[in-house]
Amino acid sequence: MAPAGQTTYQKDERVLCFHHEILYEAKILDLRHTDPDDRKSPYEYLVHYKGWKNTWDDWVPQDRLRKFTEENRELATTLRREAEAALRQKSTKTSLKKKGGSDHSSARGSEERQTSVPGRGTKRARDNDIEKEEHFYTRPSVRIVMPDNLKSLLVDDWENVTKNQQVVALPAKSSVNQILDDYLKEERPKRTGSSEVDVLEEVVMGIRDYFDKSLDKILLYRFEREQYRVLRKRWESETADKGPLDVYGAEHLTRLFATMPELIAQTNMDLQSTNRLREELSKFTIWLSKNSNHYFATRYVTASNEYIEKSRGVPNPAPGTATSRLV
């Protein structure tokens, strides 16, 4: 954040500005303090969106603006494409629903990791479950950018584990901790002030926390649980402070981002905070996509017959939704 009395953006500067969930090219026409009597109050900016009528000119707070950099322009393009794809998907689902089809879908492979087995209960309990589910689906969707090459890697990962009975060689060549540290090292210098750096570090800390809590509950396929059981036993017996963040890598981290929209949807964050988190997470997935050759495993290990037999006896965790199993 700029020091009191200074501004991060200038009049006539070319910028990118958020309007709802999309970044648009804009120009700053004017700026002023939010409190005319307080020279230390934050600035707000009058922006004109390129190609829009003047009636859309608007005073916006600084947190809706982004510098007109190549990286932010790429993010703007990606966000627009994601929004267009979501709109087409929504249109297709609406059409299917009118024809009697289901409007709920799940990512490939998620069923094996997250399938819930409903038990018997009273009608009131079942009604409450239905009410909770309906409430979940009425919440605003949180779309995180998932580049095509990451989607392909997730599909390959699913096939390697569930069909080919292979596991990722662990420890990964780059652990989750190492990947996030590399991202911080590269991203910090690009942030314009201390508040931007604080947001970045807070988001990365949250990713670490989510991964640590969710790995054994929602990110592992059944076939991988024997591998995790052996690793966990080793962590508990060793004095070295090691854990999932030090051993697992890009494959399982990307699985986390595939489930992140559901996790975020079940939080109580306001719209502004949700949009900012979505932006930060999308920046990371774009960065990981560009560096995928460096971080993702080049080979999987074919499991032995002994491992296959043992994997059949390792139970799944308690069933439930992704977030309920994080508790």
UniProtKB/Swiss-Prot annotation:
User: GO terms for CC?
Assistant: NuA4 histone acetyltransferase complex; nucleosome disassembly/reassembly complex; Rpd3S complex
Entry keyword annotation includes Nucleus: yes
Under the heading SUPFAM superfamilies, the entry gives: Chromo domain-like
Q: Which Pfam families match?
A: MRG, MSL3_chromo-like
PROSITE patterns noted in UniProt:
MRG
Q: Mind listing the UniProt keywords for this protein, alphabetically?
A: Chromatin regulator, DNA damage, DNA repair, Nucleus, Transcription, Transcription regulation
Protein function: Involved in deacetylation of histones, chromatin assembly and chromosome segregation. May act as a transcriptional oscillator, directing histone deacetylases to specific chromosomal domains. Component of the NuA4 histone acetyltransferase complex which is involved in transcriptional activation of selected genes principally by acetylation of nucleosomal histone H4 and H2A. The NuA4 complex is also involved in DNA repair.
The protein in question is named Chromatin modification-related protein eaf3
According to its UniProt entry, this protein's organism is: Emericella nidulans (strain FGSC A4 / ATCC 38163 / CBS 112.46 / NRRL 194 / M139) (Aspergillus nidulans)
